[in-house]
From Swiss-Prot:
Protein name as annotated: Adenylate kinase
Cellular component annotations (GO), alphabetically ordered: cytoplasm
Major subcellular location class: cytoplasm
Pfam families: ADK
Known role: Catalyzes the reversible transfer of the terminal phosphate group between ATP and AMP. Plays an important role in cellular energy homeostasis and in adenine nucleotide metabolism.
Region (LID): 126-142
EC number: 2.7.4.3
One GO biological process term: AMP salvage
Reaction catalysis annotation: AMP + ATP = 2 ADP
Residues reported in the UniProt entry to bind ATP: G10, A11, G12, K13, G14, T15, R127, A178
Residues given in the record as AMP binding sites: T31, R36, A57, L58, V59, G85, Y86, P87, R88, Q92, R139, R150
Length: 192
């Protein structure tokens, strides 16, 4: 099973991806996690990505497409995967179609989590408070300025993906404002 989760930052894509990974025994491919790992390890690509992420901008397609292509080719993705945070633009979606075709793969579903932007801001504030409460490290892209830029980038560049995937018959929407368990049940109903 090959799934894409769409939705604005803070919508719960990562949480739902982890639940799907456990339920269907498939790999979660979070470009955000892959990029953060590259930044922490201070790889060349990580250094490039850090500049964009900390400013709230999207990482250039050529960087992200290569990371995804390499990761999809790994053995744990043979039985399927969940893409969380990719694609973010129609250009990336078109590149993904080419990548999948070159590997004789196809998507099963694209699920968009629909959420209210004011609620997203509250979710991010809560996430920061929870991390601080346990002495954890706050994500650099969770500061208010970066988050506002990420929402703007999402509206301008990522929202057109809904139309792209709707036009090819893969898009399904789920109310992302429901509690985590209800969102999970709605996603599972789509997939089964």
């Amino acid at each position: 099973m090959r799934i894409i989760l769409l939705g604005p930052p803070g919508a719960g894509k990562g949480t739902q991806a982890r639940m799907l990974m456990e339920r269907y025994n498939i790999s979660q491919l979070s470009t955000g996690d892959m990029l953060r790992e590259a930044i922490e390890k201070e790889t060349e690509i990580g250094k490039q990505a850090k500049i964009f992420i900390e400013s709230g901008a999207l990482v250039p397609d050529f960087v992200v497409n290569q990371i995804v292509s390499d990761r999809i080719g790994e053995g744990d993705c043979v039985s399927g995967f969940i893409l969380d945070g990719y694609p973010r633009t129609v250009g990336q979606a078109e590149a993904l179609q080419r990548i999948l075709q070159s590997k004789n793969m196809q998507l099963n579903a694209v699920i968009e989590l629909i959420v209210d932007e004011d609620a997203l801001i509250e979710r991010i504030k809560k996430r920061v408070e929870e991390v601080v409460a346990v002495g954890g490290k706050i994500r650099s892209d969770d500061n208010p300025d970066s988050f506002a830029k990420r929402l703007l980038e999402y509206r301008e560049k990522t929202v057109p993906l809904s139309k792209f995937y709707s036009n090819i018959g893969l898009l399904k929407t789920v109310d992302g404002m429901a509690d985590i368990a209800d969102v999970s049940r709605a996603i599972n109903a789509i997939l089964e």
